[in-house]
């Protein structure tokens, strides 16, 4: 993923991957691709070097790049979008429920207004809701080989 995206999500996706790898030492590890130079050529080079079973991405063109460079999805490699929305159609991924996040943000703002709080809070709150899996066709269920 582009480095600015990793920073924007406070490295939480990377932390999740590294935590999963640390708690499953018997399974093969893969080096995540986070770069300031995130483009088709660098993604393809990473895929050729790492040979992942599945690619998790938040960057729209990655699936197109994979297919354009000869990977058959999901036959050769699966693809999962980390920020799936209905417009993504057939793609498998995580629906972060942006409408519900927006509603929670409005509730938080209403709370601050009702309590006559202004400015940046001393202790800021973060809104996190559980994502919903969208099955799609690009990431079928498979047994883990290890």
Predicted stretch roles:
Residues 1-146:
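Bacterial carbohydrate/catabolite-sensing allosteric modules
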């Amino acid at each position: 993923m582009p480095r600015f995206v990793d920073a924007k999500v406070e490295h939480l996706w990377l932390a999740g991957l590294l935590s999963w790898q640390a708690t499953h030492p018997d399974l093969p590890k893969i080096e995540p691709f986070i770069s300031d130079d995130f483009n088709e050529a660098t993604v393809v080079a990473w895929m050729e070097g790492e040979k992942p079973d599945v690619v998790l991405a938040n960057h729209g063109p990655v699936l197109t790049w994979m297919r354009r460079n000869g990977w058959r999805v999901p036959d050769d490699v699966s693809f999962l979008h980390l920020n799936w929305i209905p417009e993504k159609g057939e793609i498998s991924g995580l629906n972060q429920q942006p409408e519900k996040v927006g509603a929670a943000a409005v509730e938080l703002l209403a709370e601050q207004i009702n309590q006559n709080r202004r400015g940046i809070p001393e202790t800021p709150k973060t809104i996190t809701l559980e994502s919903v899996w969208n099955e799609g066709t690009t990431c079928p269920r498979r047994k883990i080989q290890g």
